[in-house]
Design a protein with these regions (language model features):
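Extracytoplasmic ligand-binding site segments that recognize negatively charged/polar headgroups
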Residues: 1, 17-21, 27, 33-173
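Short alpha-helix C-terminal cap/hinge motif
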Residues: 1-13
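Solvent-exposed polar/charged
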Residues: 6, 110, 137, 189-190
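Generic structural signal for residues in well-ordered beta-strands
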Residues: 12-14, 117, 194-196
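Short low-complexity, flexible loop/linker segments enriched in glycine and/or proline
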Residues: 28-31, 192-194
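A ligand-binding cleft/hinge motif common to bilobed small-molecule-binding domains
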Residues: 44-48, 170, 174-193
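Periplasmic-binding protein-like
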Residues: 68, 147-152, 158-159, 189-211
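Histidine- and/or cysteine-centered catalytic micro-motif in compact active-site loops
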Residues: 122, 180-184, 199-201
């Protein structure tokens, strides 16, 4: 941000919120907008914002090079990255319990993970809704509901933010979480003792966007 201000002379006030919180704020400020640019988060919530008339079309320079499936045809949002979901697990927890990094959704049902999982809340987080999409793709509608009920028994906390669980895992305050890959990579790059892995059953992914 400092470099951007230096290059352009434009001062930036940056506020990080979960995608659900961003959408709620856009809806509340519809008649008196307080935000100029939305950076990051999955495309889903910006589709809602577009349909509710909360955002305006804008075509960024260079966006012609981005494949059509990764941007809105009316230029209401533009994809800037692909975000698959990933498991992030604390290495000390794995060593203590003689476990390998999880490679299946079923691994999270093991007794060792009791009150050790931290997951985002689907009422506020795009990461959480992506998790629910993944579970439905893997287990079917009723199967995903049944699995989520079992999974809930091992969850210590649900958070507003989709990124925050990764930090708690890094700090050792939770055993594992399911987050978007960029949030997991941030924790790895900061030097926390964590392992990133993926469920063999597969995951869905989000398109990270700017609007």
């Amino acid at each position: 941000l400092e470099q951007f201000t230096k290059d352009t002379g434009i001062k930036v006030n940056f506020l990080r919120l979960s995608s659900g919180e961003v959408l709620s704020r856009l809806q509340a400020e519809k008649n008196n907008p307080q935000v100029d640019v939305l950076l990051g988060g999955p495309a889903d919530y910006l589709e809602v914002a577009k349909n509710e008339g909360l955002t305006a079309p804008y075509k960024p320079k260079g966006s012609d090079f981005i494949p059509a499936e990764f941007k809105d045809p009316q230029n209401y949002w533009t994809g800037i990255g692909i975000m698959p979901l990933a498991f992030i697990t604390n290495n000390n927890f794995l060593k203590k319990n003689n476990l390998k990094a999880p490679t299946s959704w079923q691994d999270f049902l093991k007794p060792e993970y009791k009150e050790g999982l931290i997951l985002a809340d689907a009422r506020t987080s795009g990461t959480a809704t992506e998790r629910l999409f993944s579970l439905e793709r893997v287990f079917g509608r009723q199967g995903s509901i049944d699995f989520q009920k079992k999974l809930h028994k091992n969850v210590q906390m649900y958070t507003k933010s989709g990124a925050w669980p990764a930090l708690r895992v890094g700090d050792g305050l939770a055993a594992a979480a399911m987050v978007y890959l960029p949030d997991a990579l941030d924790i790895v790059q900061l030097g926390y003792p964590v392992t990133i892995s993926y469920p063999k059953e597969g995951v869905t992914l989000g398109i990270e966007v700017v609007s």
